[in-house]
Regions:
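Short helix-to-coil transition segments within interhelical loops
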Residues: 88, 186, 192-213
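A short amphipathic helical element positioned immediately N-terminal to and/or at the very start
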Residues: 42-52
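Membrane-water interface segments at the C-terminal ends of transmembrane alpha-helices
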Residues: 3-35, 53-179, 183, 212, ...
Length: 236
């Protein structure tokens, strides 16, 4: 029993030690210490080259823009879809309609979430490239193009294709987190209260349900933001 208060600290250390090992494994070579390749002295040459690179400011701004905007859009779409599902659940008379509808949606979301990000990005590239499947279908059905159009649909300077890919991948995840959190706050009761006050379904969601459910999905939202700001394979 005396060791019981130390368990939270030991648990945190158990999770932090692998992170610290990975962090040192990245920082030491970045500081020039990599004995296997002859680097036995610490220096800041690599960081100086990074800071002097002319594309660094644009890269940082583009990373922040694409990551934050993708997270905001994904969360907004997830909230909108959850509100629509709640409205459909309230439109029926069966008490178990909400549960069955949410179960069906959850089962449909799981395969989407299981798709790797790199596989999704590769499929999206084949679809949206200037010579991709979408352009080929348009050319065959409507346009009659003989050569691919000179469109910058991938790796555009504003990161729009990256944002689109992240939104497609992260919206199902946030929607699944929302659907899992809604039963914990009795969302349907809040919606009925809002409707009794004259609010519509979506406005009741924004004013009553969202403030209650957001603390429950805050960590998943932060996880989406962290991934969107650090992802490499999707951007490539």
């Amino acid at each position: 029993m005396r060791l019981l208060p130390a368990f939270p600290i030991l648990t945190q250390l158990l999770f932090l030690l692998p992170i610290a090992a990975g962090l040192f494994g990245v920082l030491l070579p970045a500081l020039g210490y990599l004995p296997d390749l002859g680097g036995n002295q610490f220096h800041f040459k690599i960081f100086n080259q990074l800071l002097e690179h002319p594309a660094l400011p644009h890269a940082v701004l583009l990373t922040l823009f694409s990551g934050i905007i993708a997270t905001i859009i994904s969360l907004s779409l997830a909230v909108l879809l959850a509100a629509m599902l709640s409205r459909e659940s309230l439109s029926g008379n069966k008490k178990n309609k909400m549960t069955s509808l949410f179960v069906i949606v959850r089962r449909g979301l799981i395969p989407l979430i299981a798709v790797p990000h790199a596989a999704m990005a590769l499929g999206l590239a084949f679809l949206l490239a200037p010579s991709g499947w979408l352009v080929r279908w348009l050319s065959f059905l409507l346009m009659g193009w003989e050569t691919p159009p000179e469109w910058v649909t991938l790796q555009d300077p504003f990161g729009l294709s990256l944002i689109f890919g992240l939104v497609l991948k992260e919206t199902p995840y946030l929607l699944l987190m929302l659907l899992a959190a809604l039963p914990q706050i009795r969302a349907q009761e809040y919606i009925r209260i809002g409707q009794s006050l004259g609010y519509g379904n979506f406005r009741s969601w924004l004013k009553l349900v969202l403030p209650q459910v957001y603390p429950l999905i805050r960590l998943p939202v932060f996880a989406v933001l962290a991934f969107s700001l650090s992802v490499v394979d999707v951007a490539l």
